[in-house]
Amino acid sequence: MGKPKPTPQTFLNVTWNKFKASGPELKQIGWIATKHSKDIQSSSWSVGCETLDRDYAKFSVYKGYVGQLGVKHARLQSGWAKCEKEKGVYDFVWLDECVYGLNEQKVKPWICLCYGNPIYKSTLDLGAGLAPVVHSKETLDAWLKYVEATVNRYKDTVNEWEIWNEPFRQEKDYAALLQPTAELIKKLQPNSVVLVTEYGCTRPVLDELKTQGKLDLVDYWIYHPYSLNPDQGNGEGFRKLVQSYSPKYRIYQGEAGCPSALEWTHAMAFYPWTEYSQAKWDLRRMASDHMRGIPTSVFTIIDLRYTNMLQSFGLIRSNLLHQLIYKRPAYYGVQHMAGFFDDTVKIVGELKHKSNSPRKTTVAGFQKDGKSVVLVWYSDKIPSDDLKWDPVDLTIKGAAFQDPVYVEMITGKVFEIAKSTWKTEGENTTFSQLPLWDSPIMIAERSQVEMTKDVKD
């Protein structure tokens, strides 16, 4: 007889074990403690729980893993076509499970109102055309009635509403959808936050809102920066553009992530990604956004089974049966970032520095209880699969330390920094032979880093 077929519970996470077996040549003193979302008062971190409206994943499979991740927000898609299969009759049971299932874990849902509905001759796919919705009075009226029903149902739990997803340069039709939808939401829920997806149509939509005197309808402008190097597309130009129309506008990195395998379609396709580079990519995206004060949503919590493929962006690996296989290294990395960088950690911004490394290095500065915290990483190239660190002499300006420790943020390993290898002079600190690589490492005061001795499984 042959060997029994493995079940999802018997698979080993090979890449996670290799991450744990690697590390800088420093003395490990523990592992950074993780936090459940219930134990974090507030933060700007979000994770994607998208595509449940099209059954590309099952919420019940990963529900508990969202709270364990430590994020305080999660993005859902409302699924007009799934909620209204018969004209005028709404079934929100499936969405109730998601909204209230997140809320009970102290994770605040934010909802993207989308897509079209075949019973009103509009489509429900990614990139769905808006023309059938806005150029038919019956369909637009039905859409607004659906929005009203959705907002009224969840307004005690949800106050952040994104209008459509990735309208793909349909600026005239998107503006025609945005204005009545946003006006309705603001009427139904005066404290609501309206988010607009940017996808090649920002300026024309802004111009139309300005012409109509409706700039106040929008609070956040969302962008989806899928770039091979996560340190590109940092949002500064986008922020400058939208704030030139209204200083109240804020930007939101509402969807970005990295595949864990070479994909042949969707964002980031045709590049040989792995679970090693995925983990580095996600953490660099998070660190770069957070340094700039940009709220961030990581795409996505679990692999998505599209009709023609199994997409590998998930922090959790799943199979074609929607079964959970294992948490990828990226899951642990996001967990460590979300657990430490809550709203008690204040943003300082990018810090000036000097190093003897030929590679471009980013140093992000923060403060926790008035004490310095920094994230440091190579930011010049696409994340590699290498599990090796370079010894670098680094002087950080504007960061003083008294008893620093070194944290590798993917594995969460905490290391001693020998006293002979660092010194603080005034507000600057110099480290000798500090191990750096193309993923964020954190330096923080020992007293600020809650540790555990347990090895992470």
What is the predicted role of each segment?
Residues E416-D457:
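C-terminal beta-strand-rich structural cap/linker in extracellular carbohydrate-active enzymes
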Residues E171-S288, R292-T296:
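Noncatalytic carbohydrate-binding groove/subsite architecture in carbohydrate-active enzymes
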Residues T395-F415:
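Solvent-exposed beta-hairpin/edge-strand motifs
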Residues L26-A33, Y56-G64, V93-C98, W143-T150, ...:
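Alpha-helical scaffolding within the catalytic cores
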Residues H353-F401, P440:
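Carbohydrate-binding surface patches
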Residues M1-L69, G79, S447-D457:
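Mature N-terminal, pre-catalytic/accessory segment of carbohydrate-active enzymes
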Residues C258, W264-D342, V348-K360, D369:
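Aromatic/acidic polysaccharide-binding cleft in carbohydrate-active enzymes
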Residues V66-L217:
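Substrate-binding cleft and catalytic face of glycoside hydrolase catalytic domains
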